[in-house]
Swiss-Prot record:
Coiled coil, from the record: none
Tissues/organs with expression: Expressed in several neurons including AIY, CEPDL, RID, ALA, RMED, AIN, AVJ and CAN neurons.
Segments of skewed composition (Gly residues): 120-130
One MF annotation (Gene Ontology) recorded for this entry: DNA-binding transcription activator activity, RNA polymerase II-specific
Lineage of the organism: Eukaryota, Metazoa, Ecdysozoa, Nematoda, Chromadorea
Biased composition, class Low complexity, residue ranges: 106-119
Annotated organism of origin: Caenorhabditis elegans
Annotated protein name in UniProt: Homeobox protein ceh-10
Disruption phenotype annotation: RNAi-mediated knockdown causes severe defects in the ALA neuron in young adults, and when RNAi is begun embryonically, some individuals lack a detectable ALA neuron.
PANTHER family found in the cross-reference section: VISUAL SYSTEM HOMEOBOX 2 (PTHR46892:SF3)
Outcome of substituting A205T: In gm58; larval lethality. Abolishes expression of ttx-3 in AIY neurons late in embryogenesis at the 3-fold stage and in larvae, but not in earlier embryo
DNA-binding segment(s): 136-195
Length: 344
């Protein structure tokens, strides 16, 4: 029996030594040869590390040691821990389980507070969006073509109209004076932009080269007009300008031909045109008119004969009176003639 007890004690001692050697062989400070940590030399974690106020007591940073020594805070170190530390540890797993819902409640409360803060922030941001939407929109005026034409005419006369000119325009266009002022500001900005793009030639900016030449009645260069006779307009120096020139010439020729046709039609319209119905009526009345004239002819003839007899008698009497006056004169002239022929 004594031998058995001795063998049992020896085996237990060997198992304890083996367990101690196995425990120490797994220690990181034994593997790395670190002996400076006072807590690791005793084989337990400092007091209060497992009952920290962190949400999760198994967190990496809950132990008082460094992060890679957290494996040392296991069952072995807890078993070797002194009595004060054991008193601070939870007695059963139920206490640990009961402590976990509190952490969940706290986290849920945190989430609820975060959601309420987000909702309040969202409401404030939404209120800001509504406030921005409630801002007064700028009044935009839609101009008619007549109003634009009148404003353009005034802009050609003056880029900076005075208050009197703006009031006159307001009466013509039925616009407010401030709207007219804003339109002129925008139009001046547009004009400056086009002037900056095209230079000082605002005519070029508004109408282009061909429009400027037509507006000022400038002749096209000979290089372009000579190339107009060519079959291919692309061979000219400015094919687009030549194309516009040809189109304008064709339009002018067509307009001239139309005007000539209108003039000839107007001349024909001036002549009286008898419709065929009137011609038939005239042809029907012609024999009746001839008969009426023939019936009235003797009366007219008698009256004409009476008138002619009176005229003839009066003319004969006048001739006789003249002859009676001319006879003495003829004798006197004959007497003078004889005296001239017979001188003394």
């Amino acid at each position: 029996m004594a031998v058995d007890e001795m063998q049992l004690a020896a085996s237990m001692q060997m198992s304890n030594q083996m367990s101690n050697s196995q425990r120490m062989s797994f220690a990181i400070h034994e593997i790395l040869g670190i002996q400076g940590n006072a807590y690791l030399s005793h084989g337990y974690c400092p007091q209060g590390t497992f009952l920290s106020n962190q949400p999760n007591f198994m967190d990496i940073g809950s132990c008082g040691v460094s992060g890679f020594d957290r494996q040392l805070c296991g069952t072995d170190s807890i078993g070797n821990a002194p009595a004060p530390l054991m008193y601070r540890m939870p007695i059963s797993t139920s206490e640990v389980i009961t402590s976990e819902p509190q952490t969940h409640v706290s986290s849920s409360s945190i989430l609820s507070s975060a959601t309420t803060s987000n909702s309040s922030g969202g409401g404030s941001s939404g209120g800001g969006g509504k406030a921005s939407k409630r801002k007064k929109r700028r009044h935009r005026t839609i101009f008619t073509q007549y109003q634009i034409d009148e404003l353009e005419k005034a802009f050609q006369d003056s880029h900076y109209p005075d208050i009197y000119a703006r009031e006159v325009l307001a009466g013509k266009t039925e616009l407010q004076e401030d709207r007219i002022q804003v339109w002129f500001q925008n139009r001046r900005a547009k004009w400056r932009k086009t002037e900056k793009t095209w230079g000082k030639s605002t005519i070029m900016a508004e109408y282009g080269l061909y429009g400027a030449m037509v507006r000022h009645s400038l002749p096209l260069p000979e290089t372009i007009t000579k190339s107009a006779e060519a079959a291919d307009p692309q061979q000219s120096a400015a094919p687009w300008l030549l194309g516009m020139h040809k189109k304008s010439m064709e339009a002018a020729a067509h307009l001239e031909s139309v005007e000539k046709c209108d003039m000839s039609d107007s001349d024909d319209d001036d002549r009286p045109v008898t419709p065929p119905v009137q011609r038939q009526v005239k042809n029907e009345y012609k024999p009746r008119i001839i008969e009426h004239v023939q019936q009235q002819a003797p009366q007219h003839q008698s009256s004409l004969n009476f008138d002619t007899s009176l005229v003839v008698s009066s003319s004969l009497s006048q001739l006789h009176f003249q002859d009676s006056q001319m006879i003495p004169n003829n004798n006197a002239s004959l007497k003078l003639y004889h005296d001239y022929n017979n001188p003394m």
